[in-house]
A protein has these predicted regions:
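Hydrophobic hinge/microswitch elements
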Residues: 31-35, 40, 95-154
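Beta-alpha-beta core module
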Residues: 56-62, 66-67, 125-176
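Short beta-strand-centered segments that line the small-molecule binding cleft or hinge
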Residues: 11-15, 33-69, 73, 147-150
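N-terminal winged-helix
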Residues: 1-19, 24-26, 33, 99
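Short coil/turn segments
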Residues: 1-6, 52-53, 68-69, 74-78, ...
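Secondary-structure junction motif
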Residues: 85-108, 170-173, 177, 187-194
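Generic non-transmembrane alpha-helical segments
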Residues: 7-19, 103, 175-190
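A generic structural signal for short hydrophobic patches within well-formed alpha-helices
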Residues: 5, 13, 78, 123, ...
């Protein structure tokens, strides 16, 4: 996700390099599945990713921040006929996509045609400007409370930090863990500020 990459490159990497100038910190951007695979085969030390699942069955997972998903629309929930509803989703590889698809099917009894696929930050901007409807984390819509329509039961959405549970990590990684946690513990609350 571009928002995660931006925060890691501008906030996490400089602070970590200042604390540990002799340690090389490499940042790769991959899908959630690729990150998990890299952690499982020990080609990466830590992963930060979004998930609709609170934990991974093998990886040691820690929730950095959490939110619930809401239907985002300028109109009353389901007031527009399905054929006039512009549905926007994240791309199919994004972990949020499967949950968006499931929830749209639950709301409309079918998966409506998608008018746009984009990163959450772009969907946020488009919905804010009345371009279409989407499903996003609730706190991202804090500045647009009338656009939030809560779903029951409220589906969770999590920002996860994970690593392999039996891999021996050098002591310096505790500093990285703390830095990641401190940086991302209020990610969803500040999402709107980042992309306004």
């Amino acid at each position: 996700d571009s928002s995660l990459l931006h925060i890691i490159q501008t906030q996490v990497v400089p602070v970590f390099k200042e604390q540990h100038p002799d340690i090389q910190l490499n940042v790769n951007t991959n899908s959630r599945e690729q990150i998990q695979e890299s952690l499982l085969n020990a080609s990466a030390d830590y992963g930060v990713y979004f998930s609709c699942e609170e934990e991974h069955p093998i990886l040691d997972s820690r929730i950095l921040d959490e939110d619930e998903l809401v239907y985002c629309s300028k109109h009353d929930l389901l007031s527009d006929p399905l054929e006039h509803t512009k549905i926007m989703t994240v791309p199919k590889g994004n972990p949020l996509y499967a949950e968006q698809k499931r929830l749209f099917q639950q709301l409309y009894l079918t998966f409506p045609a998608t008018s746009c696929e984009a990163a959450p930050s772009i969907l946020f901007f488009l919905e804010k400007n009345g371009i279409g409807n989407t499903i996003l984390p609730s706190k991202t819509m804090a500045n647009n409370p009338d656009d939030r329509h809560f779903l029951t039961p409220a589906p969770g959405y999590f920002l996860i930090m994970a690593h392999h549970p039996i891999r021996t990590m050098p002591p310096v990684t505790r500093d990285l863990e703390t830095l990641l946690y401190d940086t991302f513990e209020t990610y969803f609350e500040h999402f709107a500020e980042l992309f306004s």
